[in-house]
Amino acid sequence: MFKQVFILCCLCLGVLPLSGQEELIHKADEVNQTIWSRFIGKDNLMYDYVGLDGEVVLPTPEECAADRPNALGWWTPIENGGFFNGMYLVAQCDRYERNKTPENREKVRRLVAGLCKLQDVGSTPGFIARGVGSDGKCHYAASSNDQNFPWFLGLGRYLETDIPTSEERQDCIERIRRQGEALQKLNWRIPGDRPNFERGWWLGSEYTACVHIATATRVLYEVTGEEKWKKLHYELIRGRMSDGRERKVCIASGPMNMAGWSAWFLSNCQYAVRILYLRETDPELKKYYAASLRNTARRAASLIPYYKRFRPSPDRKGFTPDWHTMMPPFAPQKNGKEAAALAMKQYEVWARKSPAVAQEKVWLKPALCAAWIVTLSEEADLKRNAMPEIRRMILGLDSTRLYYATFFYLENLVETLNKTASR
């Protein structure tokens, strides 16, 4: 009776209450506004962090060349351009297909332009830059698995839309082909843009590497139509690794550990395994992928309540956009391993200087990514049990008070919920 009276009052006032799904979409729209007003730079790349008024301090060409603060660009605002643009592009393609406005189309195009730039600025075949500095082309020497993998995912998803012209479609296909061929020549090792700064290997025997190589080769054969990629894809999936296991078994097992620090890149893997699951026609392989989705989701579910421990900064004193404050410590680096060791020492300083970002990294990011992992699974009971907590987290988030860009995963989460609800 109360609900009927409430709706009648709303009608009299000319205001209709939002349905459950509309509430989530409305919150995703708020996040979208925040991301595009503050976090997407002039080079169409997402910054890791910015101030509440859009303050950002970009590395200069001299600083990138000198590996300052480190050759990975960790803790700078251009640390994760390939990673973030690729995964956000997935959500923006979904958003566009849900609401085909010129504005949403343009957002997809801009993210694609950013990913193309990351391939263009380097001089080493197979290199995908993490981001670009103050001149729009300078960049750090090291890339990683986590920059390359979302690059494939994002551009592969883009080609499924009706956005690209025939010329743009062909250009994108050629870029994906060129990247695949370059990595294959390197035996699937991820190159840096200088010698000794290689970081990552897709033929490794851990879960993430197995998902990366399986998905990249799937994207390659779907977008190019070339049989050689299809053949390689299935050889790798059914083949054995150095530890004697088949890759399909490794993927089915899911990640050995699910923790707050790993949920963000493992959510990307869950999205990729779902692609493999939905597109596979071999019943045996489909069972392996279903097992992977299930195992990963079950391990992630306990991370969703992390958001309750998140405490937004009450003022602006908990953040500085100036990453220079973490120097010292600094030391020259000869390779990627030295760069990573230096970066971990620097993080201790940076986390003290910007505790607001550290709070978001530790509590909010893993909760959003874990929720997406669960939503991507085929486990109806698990999703049903998690939904009350997921809804509270989504509806309680105020993106206007956040500094660290990974709250964009809320859009990925809501778009997936919307698609699965309409099935």
Which stretches of residues belong to each language-model region?
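Bacterial N-terminal signal peptides
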Residues: 5-15
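Low-complexity, Ser/Thr/Pro/Gly-enriched N-terminal "stalk/linker" regions
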Residues: 21-80, 109-110, 114-131, 167-171, ...
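Aromatic- and glycine-enriched pocket-lining scaffold segments that form the walls
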Residues: 143-218
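Non-membrane alpha-helical segments in proteins
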Residues: 73, 77, 83-97, 110, ...
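Carbohydrate-binding/catalytic loop surfaces
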Residues: 45-76, 124-144, 192-212, 250-275, ...
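Terminal, non-catalytic domain-edge segments
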Residues: 21-41, 164-165, 269-423
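Long, leucine/valine-rich, helix-dominated scaffolding and oligomerization segments
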Residues: 203-210, 222-292, 389-404
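Aromatic- and histidine-enriched alpha-helix N-cap/loop-to-helix transition segments
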Residues: 76-90, 142-153, 204-215, 261-272, ...
